A protein has these predicted regions:
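Membrane-proximal intracellular helices of multi-pass ion channels
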Residues: 1-175
Length: 175
């Protein structure tokens, strides 16, 4: 933030609102396009909007319980569009507004980022890579059995992304 003037805070607030609208809106469109063929126009659009906001806000709430109890996103375990979009929204929403502002203002020049931004980006990358690898190593002979390589990677990556949320999952960890 590093601003002593109200004008700087107003500009930051505008960027936060615009950024949130862009990220959640884009996610809602992508997810809606995926859900509409399966659930129809109204329900598919609602699911797209709801899951986009839930993922971006790191809430982890889903509406998929109608497919089977506690299913979350298990029926989309191998769906790169759904899982990729939700993962991206979780990560972008999770890194925070100050990091976004720094990325925006410094134009992707890592050397000039705030220490906070550097720590958040490096820690996020390490946790995602480490979590993906560890999940694979621990579950390759359990819940990942029967999945192809692409599905295994997607399941492991999503399982590394979602611990920062309240409850999305794409594999049944209960067995």
């Amino acid at each position: 933030v590093n601003t002593l003037q109200i004008g700087g805070m107003v500009k930051l607030a505008k960027r936060i609102i615009i950024g949130t609208a862009i990220f959640e809106g884009t996610g809602a469109i992508i997810l809606s396009l995926r859900f509409i063929p399966q659930y129809g126009l109204f329900q598919g659009t609602w699911y797209g909007i709801f899951h986009s906001i839930s993922a971006f806000c790191n809430a982890g709430f889903d509406l998929m319980g109608h497919t089977e109890q506690y299913s979350s996103l298990c029926s989309y375990a191998g769906d790169w569009v759904v899982i990729g979009t939700i993962s991206t929204l979780i990560i972008i929403g999770g890194i925070g507004f100050i990091v976004w502002d720094d990325l925006y203002r410094k134009r992707w020049d890592f050397r000039h980022y705030l220490l906070h931004t550097k720590i958040v980006l490096v820690t996020t990358a390490v946790l995602l890579a480490g979590g993906t690898i560890l999940f694979y190593l621990m579950e390759r002979d359990n819940i990942l059995v029967g999945m192809n390589g692409s599905q295994k990677f997607l399941a492991c990556f999503f399982s590394a992304v979602t611990p920062r949320t309240a409850g999305f999952n794409n594999v049944d960890t209960a067995g």
